[in-house]
């Protein structure tokens, strides 16, 4: 019995070996057949849904521009006659890599030249000076698209009559209906900063993007109504002719991200743009030229600028902060070498700052080191700068915005908006050397707000209306649920603006300085406008 079981076991082993050998042979034959193209490719299954989809518009044919360099095609070393693992192959690969890196570095190098309109133009029409200016000089958040957190029911419950009236007024703002937001693409890349022109004659919006492009939208334009009737021809082509996109202009004054912009009310024809390419440029809106106003002495110095501001009573002095934690001041009327003053205020980046409009020697900074600090320029040492006071948040603070009433609004990654009322503490009468204790620096109001933007959405920053038409101060900020929220200085929500066609988060939100116009910019370079 023992012998039979032993022979059976050996037989079983042989049988399994034969099966394995056969499987290996079949696998090899299948692979050989596939590589020889014997087996036909698998056909995609047709679905009834795909058959009912409307026919997509054919992509426009690409026309090769004259003088355009041919695109380098990939080619194996064997076809180029280079032996595998040879020194020649290694050297050529290294040279190619270095050439690509050099080209990328060249694209990002700051250009200090003055630019004409044609040198900056990326797309769109030529800017007309008259037409352009218009002539008068919660717990940690998870985004839930289109889910409102404020609406008509909240307005109805408002007991304060003036607050209710303001809520109805701001909530009544309507999305610009001339074109859907997904058709108003003013910049090729993600919008980082926006501003309105101070003119009240018409809404004129400027948007700066990640790659240094500057988009311009004149929202006074009307959608053309075509009366042309086509008897034959392609229907889709006729629709395109009858329904053109809005007229936009895109320029490229910088080589890297435009981080901040400012138009001084007394110089409405000049737009200042600050960039990560370490420069501040001045765009003349009448001459449509751009000149470098400030940059480090050496073109190789990399000092990315994170914010820019100007005092209301001084159209000649620029103030800025950097990603290296520095604060700078420059009087453009004087020699650059003698008139530039800088202070190192933080070891980590300053993400945003603003001057106190009525007393510009006071300013507030927001930093990656989790602080909001209040400073006094009248008593600011270059060697050991000390703030008037500081408040530490749980996570980094993105921006600190001052309003004319002496209140500072900040946004922070701890999912909060904080409002500090220094006006009530008598900031306007403080003498040099005045300091605040930690208790006095605590925020007066904290509002829960989802600030978890992630990698692809621009950081949310509050922005006050400079000259509101009532005594109630208000600011706007993007909402991760694809809205723009408006709050009062006491933390009361005034509105949650949305609308059809908003397909991305309007993360960059700005108020017009005096009119109830609000614009939001998205990561796809598109604009939403409420008026």
Swiss-Prot record:
<feature type="region of interest" description="Disordered">
    <location>
        <begin position="218"/>
        <end position="264"/>
    </location>
</feature>
<dbReference type="GO" id="GO:0005634">
    <property type="term" value="C:nucleus"/>
</dbReference>
<keyword id="KW-0227">DNA damage</keyword>
<dbReference type="InterPro" id="IPR050853">
    <property type="entry name" value="WD_repeat_DNA-damage-binding"/>
</dbReference>
<keyword id="KW-0238">DNA-binding</keyword>
<dbReference type="GO" id="GO:2000001">
    <property type="term" value="P:regulation of DNA damage checkpoint"/>
</dbReference>
<dbReference type="Pfam" id="PF00400">
    <property type="entry name" value="WD40"/>
</dbReference>
<protein>
    <recommendedName>
        <fullName>DNA damage-binding protein cmr1</fullName>
    </recommendedName>
</protein>
<dbReference type="InterPro" id="IPR001680">
    <property type="entry name" value="WD40_rpt"/>
</dbReference>
<keyword id="KW-0853">WD repeat</keyword>
<comment type="similarity">
    <text>Belongs to the WD repeat DDB2/WDR76 family.</text>
</comment>
<keyword id="KW-0677">Repeat</keyword>
<feature type="compositionally biased region" description="Basic residues">
    <location>
        <begin position="53"/>
        <end position="64"/>
    </location>
</feature>
<feature type="compositionally biased region" description="Acidic residues">
    <location>
        <begin position="233"/>
        <end position="245"/>
    </location>
</feature>
<feature type="region of interest" description="Disordered">
    <location>
        <begin position="37"/>
        <end position="83"/>
    </location>
</feature>
<feature type="repeat" description="WD 1">
    <location>
        <begin position="186"/>
        <end position="227"/>
    </location>
</feature>
<dbReference type="InterPro" id="IPR036322">
    <property type="entry name" value="WD40_repeat_dom_sf"/>
</dbReference>
<feature type="repeat" description="WD 4">
    <location>
        <begin position="345"/>
        <end position="385"/>
    </location>
</feature>
<dbReference type="GO" id="GO:0003677">
    <property type="term" value="F:DNA binding"/>
</dbReference>
<comment type="function">
    <text>DNA-binding protein that binds to both single- and double-stranded DNA. Binds preferentially to UV-damaged DNA. May be involved in DNA-metabolic processes.</text>
</comment>
<feature type="repeat" description="WD 3">
    <location>
        <begin position="300"/>
        <end position="340"/>
    </location>
</feature>
<feature type="repeat" description="WD 5">
    <location>
        <begin position="392"/>
        <end position="431"/>
    </location>
</feature>
<feature type="repeat" description="WD 6">
    <location>
        <begin position="454"/>
        <end position="497"/>
    </location>
</feature>
<dbReference type="InterPro" id="IPR015943">
    <property type="entry name" value="WD40/YVTN_repeat-like_dom_sf"/>
</dbReference>
<feature type="repeat" description="WD 7">
    <location>
        <begin position="500"/>
        <end position="531"/>
    </location>
</feature>
<feature type="repeat" description="WD 2">
    <location>
        <begin position="253"/>
        <end position="293"/>
    </location>
</feature>
<dbReference type="GO" id="GO:0006974">
    <property type="term" value="P:DNA damage response"/>
</dbReference>
């Amino acid at each position: 019995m023992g012998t039979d079981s032993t022979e059976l076991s050996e037989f079983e082993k042989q049988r399994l070996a034969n099966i394995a050998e056969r499987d290996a042979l079949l696998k090899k034959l299948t692979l050989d057949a596939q590589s020889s193209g014997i087996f036909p490719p698998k056909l995609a299954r047709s679905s009834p849904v795909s058959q009912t989809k409307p026919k997509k518009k054919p992509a426009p044919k690409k026309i090769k521009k004259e003088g355009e360099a041919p695109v380098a095609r990939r080619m194996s070393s064997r076809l180029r006659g280079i032996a595998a693992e040879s020194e020649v192959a290694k050297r050529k690969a290294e040279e190619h890599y270095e050439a690509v890196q050099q080209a990328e570095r060249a694209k990002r190098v700051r250009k200090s030249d003055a630019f004409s309109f044609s040198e900056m133009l990326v797309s769109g029409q030529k800017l007309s000076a008259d037409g352009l200016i218009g002539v008068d000089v919660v717990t940690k958040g998870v985004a839930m698209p289109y889910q409102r957190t404020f609406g008509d029911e909240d307005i109805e419950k408002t007991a304060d009559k003036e607050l209710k009236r303001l809520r109805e007024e701001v909530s009544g703002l309507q999305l610009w209906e001339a074109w859907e937001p997904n058709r108003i693409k003013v910049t090729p890349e993600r919008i980082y900063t926006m501003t309105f022109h101070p003119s009240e004659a018409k809404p004129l919006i400027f948007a700066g993007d990640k790659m240094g492009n500057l988009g311009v939208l004149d929202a006074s334009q009307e959608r053309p109504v075509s009366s042309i009737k086509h008897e034959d021809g392609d229907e889709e082509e006729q629709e395109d002719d009858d329904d053109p996109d809005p007229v936009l202009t895109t320029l490229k004054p910088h080589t890297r991200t435009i981080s901040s912009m400012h138009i001084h009310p007394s110089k409405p024809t000049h737009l200042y743009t600050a960039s990560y390419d370490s420069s501040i440029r001045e765009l003349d809106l009448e001459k449509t030229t751009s000149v470098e106003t400030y940059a480090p002495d050496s073109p190789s110095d990399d000092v990315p600028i994170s914010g820019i501001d100007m005092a209301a009573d001084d159209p000649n002095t620029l103030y800025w902060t950097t990603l290296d934690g520095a604060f700078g001041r420059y009087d453009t009327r004087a020699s650059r070498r003698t008139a530039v003053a800088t202070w190192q205020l933080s070891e980590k980046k300053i993400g945003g700052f603003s001057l106190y409009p009525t007393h510009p020697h006071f300013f507030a900074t927001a930093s990656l080191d989790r602080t909001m600090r209040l400073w006094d320029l009248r008593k600011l040492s270059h060697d050991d700068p000390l703030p008037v006071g500081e408040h530490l948040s749980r996570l980094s603070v993105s921006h600190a915005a001052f309003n004319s009433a002496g209140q500072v609004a900040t946004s922070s990654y701890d999912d909060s908006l904080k409002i500090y009322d220094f006006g009530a503490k008598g900031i306007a009468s403080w003498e040099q050397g005045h300091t605040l204790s930690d208790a006095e620096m605590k925020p007066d109001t904290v509002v829960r707000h989802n600030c978890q933007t992630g990698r692809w959405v621009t950081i949310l920053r509050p922005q006050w209306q400079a000259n509101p038409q009532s005594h109630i101060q208000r600011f706007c900020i993007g909402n991760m649920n694809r809205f723009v929220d408006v709050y009062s200085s006491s933390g009361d929500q005034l509105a949650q603006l949305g609308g059809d066609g908003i397909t991305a988060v309007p993360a960059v939100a700005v108020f017009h300085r005096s009119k109830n116009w609000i614009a939001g910019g998205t990561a796809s370079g598109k604009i939403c406008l409420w008026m």
